[in-house]
């Protein structure tokens, strides 16, 4: 059982046509595939969607088993500004913290269609490892812990 938040890059970089038809559409197709696979794998799996660009990252859909809600929210996304991965991960962690089923494993999937600065990657890793250490069961060493996030797609 998993609760997954998919972080979508809706920055200006995703207008690029180097992936047919655009980087953004390639992400939308990947979200469709990922959300479908997650919800079919286990009926208790949930998927949520968060945008990373604009004024602030925004949760479009909280984790839900309803594939239709996930797919519908993709049509309303506005491409604007620059992606803020660090803030997006923090907001995704909050959304996962308040999930309905606390027995679900937490997973954050990040689609990056824009360049990611080296220092931002370090900040994001630090945030994910810090939250992993806070939520680790007693007796678990830090070497046994896995960070909550991983980059699934980088189109830059």
Give the residues covered by each predicted segment:
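Charged, surface-exposed interaction regions in soluble eukaryotic proteins
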Residues: 112-146
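Von Willebrand factor
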Residues: 1-111, 116-119, ...
């Amino acid at each position: 059982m998993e609760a997954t938040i998919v972080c979508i890059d809706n920055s200006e970089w995703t207008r690029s046509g180097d992936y047919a038809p655009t980087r953004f559409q390639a992400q939308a197709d990947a979200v469709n595939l990922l959300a479908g696979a997650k919800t079919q794998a286990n009926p208790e799996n949930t998927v949520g969607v968060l945008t990373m660009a604009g004024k602030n990252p925004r949760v479009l859909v909280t984790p839900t088993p309803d594939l239709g809600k996930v797919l519908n929210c993709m049509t309303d996304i506005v491409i604007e500004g620059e992606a803020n991965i660090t803030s997006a991960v923090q907001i995704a962690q909050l959304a996962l913290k308040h999930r309905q089923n606390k027995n679900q494993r937490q997973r954050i999937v990040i689609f990056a269609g824009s360049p990611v600065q080296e220092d931002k990657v370090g900040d994001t890793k630090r945030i994910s490892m810090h939250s992993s250490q806070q939520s680790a069961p007693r007796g678990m060493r830090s070497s046994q812990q896995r960070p909550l996030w991983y980059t699934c797609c980088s189109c830059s």
